[in-house]
Amino acid sequence: MVLSQRQREELNKAIADYLASNGFMEALESFKKETDMPGDIDKKYAGLLEKKWTSVIRLQKKVMDLEGRLAEAEKEYISGTPSREKRSPTEWIPRPPERSALLGHRAPITRVLFHPVYSVVVSASEDASIKVWDYETGDFERTIKGHTDSVQDIAFDHTGQFLASCSADMTIKLWDFKSYECLRTMHGHDHNVSSVCFLPSGDHVVSCSRDKSIKMWEVATGYCVRTFTGHRDWVRMVRVNSDGSLLASCSNDQTVRVWVVGTKECKLELREHDHVVECVAWAPAHAQLCGAAGDSNRRPGAGGAQGTGPFLVSGSRDKTIKVWDVSTGLALFTLVGHDNWVRGVKFHPGGKYLLSASDDKTLRVWELAHQRCCKTLDAHSHFCTSLDFHRTAPYVVTGSVDQTVKVWECR
């Protein structure tokens, strides 16, 4: 492309201003002489070269983003993937590129979580803060501060009125999510508190810790009312089932345990992982798991009997995801495909898919009925540590050691 005479003159004056403002006086005099530039440079050319340069970079970034979206759209068009309008919401899965990348944390993201009512996503980080973002606009809303060390996990009660957080500072905090006020701080663990969740009733919080214990706390008073012991090493995560009768926990001792909330009894110890078990998730009642496992996947002596659930999923540093039938204590099947530690697992609200996040930097979508990975997204530039799937809106969120939170649209 050839510049017009006027464009050439404007470019020369912008270059001259750049040379003058950076003190390259000899080069400026030589340049003015070579280009026959008269007198002083008009002030309107001040900083023009830098502005043009940065605008070109911004445009290049936008073009690359659009090219990526176009390539993905062409790929899906060729493969015959239907648009969202033609698909049932139970079929929607996250697709690249991300809708937004949320920047603000100064250390790795440990947990991401959608609010059950508001259009916000909450992130916890090793920078000891919790941040609130509008996932539709990508806008940062506020920072919640109070912990003095890495925030390890966060959880909402079913109304979204209360937020619980736990930290390496050995405390659990309860926050009013309207006023962002810390209502109470719960002390009792002797080491890093790694996970927290609400019982469905909202009147109790459950936590687990590197001190090998699981504790239940009364929300109204902040008192510890129950302690579950049995794990032989750091308890990484604890999650409660939909009716609040069972707890699932996983540990550095390479086991998953299922506990009866009312009696503190350890109902099951599941032992098939070969490394630290990082995460667990309960399957929704409508998850497509009952017919997913054939007899070949069962242990000898199972007699081919089909369990009725409930079902539980665990992700491990052995790079695998296991699906368990809690009624029989058997692993139904193992999902293999990640190239590094599995850090997060989450069921699709429709029950057809399972999503997983891994230190291989990917977000994977697994079709449960066929036990296969049907989509892999290169989600982050570093380890992918956490994910969540919105219960009603078509969004997935991921967090990473790269300090970003990414929102993905589903279709």
Curated annotation (Swiss-Prot):
Residues 77-89 have a biased composition (Basic and acidic residues). This is Lissencephaly-1 homolog. Positively regulates the activity of the minus-end directed microtubule motor protein dynein. May enhance dynein-mediated microtubule sliding by targeting dynein to the microtubule plus end. Required for several dynein- and microtubule-dependent processes. Its main location: cytoplasm. Residues 54-80 form a coiled coil. Residues 7-39 form the LisH domain. It comes from Ixodes scapularis (Black-legged tick). InterPro entries: Dynein_regulator_LIS1 (IPR017252), G-protein_beta_WD-40_rep (IPR020472), LIS1_N (IPR037190), LisH (IPR006594), PAC1-like_LisH-like_dom (IPR056795), WD40/YVTN_repeat-like_dom_sf (IPR015943), WD40_repeat_CS (IPR019775), WD40_repeat_dom_sf (IPR036322). It comes from the Eukaryota. The keyword Cytoplasm applies. Keywords: Cell cycle, Cell division, Coiled coil, Cytoplasm, Cytoskeleton, Microtubule, Mitosis, Repeat, Transport, WD repeat. One of its GO terms (biological process) is retrograde axonal transport. GO terms for molecular function: dynein complex binding; microtubule plus-end binding. Residues 77-96 are annotated as: Disordered. Dimerization mediated by the LisH domain may be required to activate dynein. GO terms for cellular component: axon cytoplasm; centrosome; cytoplasmic microtubule; kinetochore; microtubule associated complex; neuron projection; neuronal cell body; nuclear envelope. It is found in: Cytoplasm, Cytoskeleton; Cytoplasm, Cytoskeleton, Microtubule organizing center, Centrosome. WD repeats lie at residues 104-145, 146-187, 188-227, 230-269, 272-334, 337-376, 379-411. Belongs to the WD repeat LIS1/nudF family.
